[in-house]
Amino acid sequence: MSREIEKEHQVGTLSNQQGLDEQGLDLQKNDQQNHDEKSHIVKEHFDSEKIQQRYPAIERKPLTLTINGEEVGPIEVPLTMTMIDFLHEYLDLTGTHFGCGQGICHACTVMEIHPDGSKSETRTCIFGAHYFSGKNIVTIEGQATKKDGVLILTPIQQAFIDNFAFQCGYCAPGFVAGATVFLDRLNRHPIKRANLEKAIEEALNDHICRCTGYVRYYEAIRDVALATPGCVID
């Protein structure tokens, strides 16, 4: 690769990283006021002719859940509505990406927080919205936090940027969820340093990335695992 082409490649890659806001990795916009407004909007939408036309005479199920720390519902959702449609169309949370529509690529993955505090991955393109009733989930918009008006990325998000882990970014929200769940598991059940590489591959194996060949994603996760006390045993 010539120096000119290499320079253009580096600039283009940096430009992609600067577009991170558009990929939804660092969004945290649901304060209480926004939550109240969105809840009202959701109820209006579900009473509109648009919803009636799209889901005519379809059985509905009750839905109440926690999303990014805010309670949503109770509302009635069509039995056939997927969770990703609910997030996109009625909560304006578009950072969770629709990929294959079959639960294979894991671009649509969000993180579920269980009552004991443990975390797991859940796909939103293959499960109905009503399936999430009573659950506590975190979308990509809820990963970062704000302090004194300054956005603070999670260690995984920052590591993905530092390692130039992605190019187009379409798979990145799913990788953030998957990597965060993996690190939570390591915190609870540390592993030996010699087993870390294999454990990362096994944990993120189902997440598909068509740009970077996974290596930089895995390197970023490894860096965070090694830098987090208690995750890895020497």
Regions found by a protein language model. Give the residues of each.
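Signature of N-terminal electron-transfer/Fe-S-associated modules in redox systems
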Residues: 2-234
